[in-house]
Amino acid sequence: MTEYKLVVVGAGGVGKSALTIQLIQNHFVDEYDPTIEDSYRKQVVIDGETCLLDILDTAGQEEYSAMRDQYMRTGEGFLLVFAVNSAKSFEDIGTYREQIKRVKDAEEVPMVLVGNKCDLPSWNVQNEQAREVAKQYGIPYIETSAKTRMGVDDAFYTLVREIRKDKDNKGRKGRKTNKPNRRFKCKML
């Protein structure tokens, strides 16, 4: 069974833990208890393949930022979570993305942009803004509500699909380039 290491990142209070717990335990946690770092595992079937999701729910608070490099090194894919009612959390997404790319030393890292708290009546980040940023980054955008469970499975499953795509692409590139290019042939006269 394939195991996928997923990391949930974003500013404090955007609902990273609520999304993760909704996926794992099917219930909504409405009280805010800042996370330092929690790990969850769940077996799921995605596109007919049984797999194990190893999900790291990370600290959004700045005082725990020193821990980020370590989990970014081990993660295979990242949910970049912001709250639709917080423009600041949306602005912070770029910083998380750049840090992930720096730590992974790669331009292409599997990521999904997630706009959470879509059940709230007032949004400070519009759908079009988020879609435009996702398009610039070349990643999918999913709107979620941990409270109503809207889009929760879709966000995590889309990330697994992005990881699979990335592995397929790397596998193809690796197979192509191992033989030297021989243009000239020697002839004995």
Curated annotation (Swiss-Prot):
Binding site for GTP: 10-17, 57-61, 116-119
Protein's name according to its UniProt entry: Ras-like protein 1
Keywords assigned by UniProt, alphabetized: Cell membrane, GTP-binding, Hydrolase, Lipoprotein, Membrane, Methylation, Nucleotide-binding, Prenylation
UniProt source species: Drosophila grimshawi
Localisation per UniProt entry: Cell membrane
Recorded name of the encoding gene: Ras85D
Gene3D superfamilies named among the record's database cross-references: P-loop containing nucleotide triphosphate hydrolases
Modified residues (Cysteine methyl ester): 186
GO molecular function: G protein activity; GTP binding
Known function: Ras proteins bind GDP/GTP and possess intrinsic GTPase activity. Plays a role in eye development by regulating cell growth, survival of postmitotic ommatidial cells and differentiation of photoreceptor cells. During larval development, mediates Ptth/tor signaling leading to the production of ecdysone, a hormone required for the initiation of metamorphosis.
EC id: 3.6.5.2
Motif (Effector region): 32-40
Mechanisms controlling activity: Alternates between an inactive form bound to GDP and an active form bound to GTP. Activated by a guanine nucleotide-exchange factor (GEF) and inactivated by a GTPase-activating protein (GAP).
Record lipid sites (S-geranylgeranyl cysteine): 186
Catalytic activity: GTP + H2O = GDP + phosphate + H(+)
GO CC term, one of those recorded: membrane
SMART domains registered for this protein in UniProt: RAB, RAS, RHO
Pro-sequence residue ranges: 187-189
Principal location listed in the UniProt entry: membrane
Topological type in the membrane: Lipid-anchor
Biological process according to GO: signal transduction
Family according to the record: Belongs to the small GTPase superfamily. Ras family.
UniProt xrefs under InterPro entries: P-loop_NTPase, Small_GTP-bd, Small_GTPase, Small_GTPase_Ras-type
